Every structure is written in structure tokens, then in C-alpha cells.
Amino acid sequence: MDKTHSSQGKCPVMHGGNTSVTTNNMDWWPKALNLDILHQHDKKTDPMDPTFNYSEAFKTLDLAAVKQDLYALMTDSQDWWPADWGHYGGLMIRMAWHSAGTYRIADGRGGAGTGNQRFAPLNSWPDNANLDKARRLLWPIKKKYGNKLSWADLIILAGNVAYESMGLKTYGFAGGRADIWHPEKDIYWGSEKQWLAPSDNPNSRYSGERDLENPLAAVMMGLIYVNPEGVDGNPDPLRTAQDIRITFARMAMDDEETVALTAGGHTVGKCHGNGKAQNLGPEPEAEDVEAQGLGWLNKHGRGVGRNTVTSGIEGAWTTHPTQWDNGYFSLLLGYDWELKKSPAGAWQWEPINIKEEDKPVDVEDPTIRHNPIMTDADMAMKMDPEYRKISEKFYKDPAYFSEVFARAWFKLTHRDLGPKSRYLGPEVPAEDLIWQDPIPQVDYRLSDDDITALKAKILASGLSIAELVTTAWDSARTFRGSDYRGGANGARIRLAPQKDWEGNEPVRLQKVLKVLTDIQTGLSQKVSIADLIVLGGTAAVEKAAQDAGVNIRVPFASGRGDASQEMTDIESFAVLEPLHDAYRNWQKKDYVVQPEELMLDRTQLMGLTAHEMTVLIGGMRVLGANYAGSAHGVFTDRVGVLSNDFFVNLTDMSYNWKPAGNNLYQIIERKTGTVKWTATRVDLVFGSNSVLRSYAEIYAQDDAKEKFVHDFVNAWTKVMNADRFDLA
């Protein structure tokens, strides 16, 4: 038979290259370290030119022109997705809300800062149903302004303009959110294997009475906040209130902000459930190519307009859903409500004996009126005693409600943008807000001669290399690239709560701070404690490198300010407390998660790569920077010298490695049986993991002594400057 003919009908692609069917390493070894979380959003996935800087591009944007286009869009109803009552405001607000609403304060991940709603899993979450249509409506505007306006900024701006177009005076808007180009790999959304799995299912995010797993804020896989029908879909406003309080607290919101956001979000727009959920097609990620990235395509009637199905709940909350007013509280508090089922079979609350004029009109026919609705979450604003007090206050004082909501909305949509120094645009509010972690600007810059003299003073102060290195590290390590909080700028390590954190070794910390403060007091020129802390670490690293035979100047840029206690929200900063730090070979207690996995999580938050993590661990060990001076992992006889000894001895087959207790190992000389060193899992993983060992071998080579020092200095400087947005 002809060979060409016999091959017809076979797959033209070798299955080894078919990513949809191949078995990858994590399938074979699911407990292996997932180093991929350290290698995201690099130039290989970024289509922009290497010199492109989004912040600089945004500065050239005509924001007023963009807003005018958005105002026009709000009432330019499209046949393929008609606007309710001829106004897209409610849809745009929901899109912006759900973009920002994934933020959680525990690890700073989620939120609106990256435009991640465009990608899986968020683009296909049940709670984000039909937001694909909102983004498609925005496409002409994104297309028009191009690279000057990111999707991340446009999504939030559209929500702001939607409110303004309906009568709310917003608090402000800041740009500066750069887009990502593929789904995030580091965010833990929960371990459930099905959408909207109830809390009694396997892999539940709940334990005990109803303890929500940290760092999660949403109550179900695929939801942004709480279940609108009630806990696990069972209506009970008081139980729902408990969920709301926990969820919003984990988003850094207090009770007043929670009521304001709930009411303000439901003052406009409507829920959609006028049909059966089974008429909806699959979510975007599961749809076929002809859907072109859209999902939830509705086969019921026209499938749009009054036939739209989204959450399954059907109706508007207020009489005038395209106007900013106090109608939410008028209806919620002015009527008694009873449970009903929507046409889609969802639980919702409807008013008893409502006046005809209080009913909102149909989205297409103004001669028809329908009952307003409330979700179980809305009823919690009435039934929970604390929420009720706030609701009544807002009802009696609409102006106060509008102000509180505008501020809470700004906080919701800007919380993960970081400090005010990252804000861009003409609508940035002048006021400094405590949740922005304000830091005073400095009015000095140290010259090279000043820096050299200060380093000499610090090294002559009697403080050890380890003391200087650990203090600088502890000050800087709180930075997290998820929401741009923490870092050495502000020197908050000298303030509550950081000065008392166990991981900061308060006694050692106060000793170092006193010496640095005395140096500061004796100077004729201005210099902040924040700068002195980092400069102390810089001087120590230079000295340790010199002692290793490598002369190198560690980069240092002055300009850090010193925050005050009044500028510091103690409760808000509590979430930044390190409970583990592999770089200092310490964790507060044993956790379910292995120490090396905790190391990866912390490393990712700090914005470091796998090889930067590797070189920093090796350097910190030989510098003697372990917590409380522990000897674990200090594979050197020259402590305080920036040598590659950690890697040389880790990869030396003259030694054998044996467990000696919980997270403790002994390094034994094979010939003599003598215990040479001790180590933890985060030390040995650099020899056991094949990828990390490949990096360790690079630094263990005979020709790597200078490369090791240079790479350590580069990674060290990156950590010290992680929060120096003024240097970017």
C-alpha cells in the first residue's frame, strides 16, 4: 500500500508535542515543587517592546477624552447585547467590582491591578457570567487608545464613569495598572474541584464551626464574595451576615464600608434570571472557537435583554436602577420582604404589598413594572443588628452615604495599586489615606562621599555583619509585589506592630536601631533611619565580599522616608508579619505546608526568580543571618564571609545526609561518621530538587566565586529597592 495513502487520517502532530493530552511532570509527581510560580509574566509572554513603559505611556493619555467616550458608550445600546433600560452602567460597575473584588488582604493577591479578569479561571467563574460581554463592549475604546490604556485601568475607569454618569460624585481615579498576558499561577483560589461546591463537600474551604481557610475571602469556588441566595444556597440573612463580615474583613473593609459597598453596588443595575440556567451554553474557556471567547450564550428566546440569565436571581433592587439615589434603603427598610423563587429557580426576597410606583419598570417596556428584589446579602443589611444601625444612618443621611460609598469604592478599586506614589493621572485625590501606607517624602540626596563616610561610621559602630544584614533584610522582606505593600521605605520596622514581631528578634532589633539612631543624631546632614538601615546592610555585604576576595560596590540609592506611628494602621500591617522566612531559616511553628513550599510563596511575593532565591539563600547562610544565630545550613567555617561555601559543601559527595528530627538533618562525613553540620528542609532542597540543584552547581563551581558575589549583590539590591517606585 502507498505510504502516503496509508498515513491519511492520522494526527499530523506528534503526541509528545500535544499539550492537551501529554502528561507533565506535576502529573507524575504532584508533590514536586512548582517553581513555575517564580517565572511568570516575563518578556517571553509580553508582546510589548522591550523599552515600553506603561506608566510613561499612560502619562500621555487624554483621560478626559477617554471618559467622554465612556460616557457615550453607557447609553449606546447594541443589538447583540442590549443595555438594560438603555444604560450599561450596572454591567460596567459589576465588571469593575468583580475585577477589584478578588483582592484579599492576607497575601495581597487578586484585585484589579493586572487585568486578570480577561483570563482563566476568572473569565469563566460562575460569578463573572456575562462580564465577557462588558469587556467586548469596551473593546472599541481599548482599540482606540491602544497601549496608553491598559485593560486593567480601563475596567476600573469604566466602573467609575458608570457611577458618574448615573449621578454619583466619585472620590477619584488613579491609573498605573499594567496588564499581564497569561493567567496567574501563584494565586490560590481554593482546593474544590467543582464550581459553587457547598461547604460540606470534600476539599471544602471551611473547617470547624465555619472557619474559612486562609487566605481565601470568597465563600465558594467561583464566587467573588458570598452566595447571594444564602449560605450554601440556603436563605438565612443572619448566617449570611456572618459570611459577609468575614469576607469583607478579609478584603480590608469594616462594617460601615461593607454596608456602603453592598448598598452602593445594588443601587443601580439588576440581577438576571428570566429563564432557565440549563439554556445557557458553557463558560468562555469551554466554548468552541466560533464563540470567539464568549460564553454563557443563551438559547432562551432572544437570549438577551429581558431574557438574560446570569446569576439566576431576577430583578432590580431599586425603583430607578439607572440613577444614583437613596432608593436602596427606602425599599429595604420601608417594606417587609418574603422569600420567592425567580423564573430560573433561585431564591430571592420580594416586597409585600409594594406600591405600584415603587416598582422598577421593565428593561425593555416602560409600561410594565416588576417587583424589586433583594438577595440574602441585602437582607443581612436589614436583619443583622450592626448592619441595620449603619443602614438606618445612611437612609437618614443620603449625603453621608454617598460620601462613604465613594471613598469605599475608591479603596476597593485601588487597594492593590500600592502606595500613592504609584498613582497616575489628573484625578488622583490629594488626601493621604492611612490604608495607602503613607510615607513622608524626603528633601535630601546623599552624595557618593556622604555614602562612603556613613558606611565607614556604621562598620565602626561595633555592630556585626550578621546584625546589619539581618536588620536590613527584616526591614525589606515585608514587601509583596501582589499589592505593593511593605518594604524598607518608611522604616516601619521601628514602629508597632513590626518592632514586636517575633521574626524580627525584638531585642536584637532594638540594639541595632539604637546604634543607627545615635549615628543619625550625630550627623550634620539629613538622613532617614530607613536609609541607614539599608545602608548598614549594604556596608556589611560589601565588607563580607571584600573578605571573600571580591571588591564590589553594592548599589545604594538614598531617598527613603521615615513613617510615623500615626501614619501606620497597626491592624492593617499585622497581615504583613512573617510567620516563616527561609532566607533566615526560620518559621514560627510547624505548618501543614512544607517549609520549601512556604519559601516559594514568600519568594514569589517578593518578586524573585528561582536563581535569585538560590543565590540569596546561599549568601544569607554564610553571612550568619539565620534567626537567633542558628547554625542550621551554615555550611562554612568562615561565617561572615560572602563565599560560595554553602553550595560547595551542599554538592560535595564527601558528605551523607540523614534526618535528625522534625525538619532537622545532619550532614555527616562519610569517612569518619562525624557530624559536620546541621540543616533544614529549605537548605537541603537546593540539593534534592533537580532544578534548584542545577543552580546550586553553578555557584559551587571553581570559577563561580565572583559570579556568586555579583549575583548575590544584584538580588540583594533588588530586595532592598523593591518598594522604591521612584527609581523605576
Swiss-Prot record:
Heme b binds at H266. Binds 1 heme b (iron(II)-protoporphyrin IX) group per dimer. It is an enzyme of class 1 (oxidoreductase). GO terms for biological process: cellular response to hydrogen peroxide; hydrogen peroxide catabolic process. The keyword Metal-binding applies. Keywords: Heme, Hydrogen peroxide, Iron, Metal-binding, Oxidoreductase, Peroxidase. GO terms for cellular component: cytosol. This is Catalase-peroxidase. It comes from Shewanella sp. (strain W3-18-1).
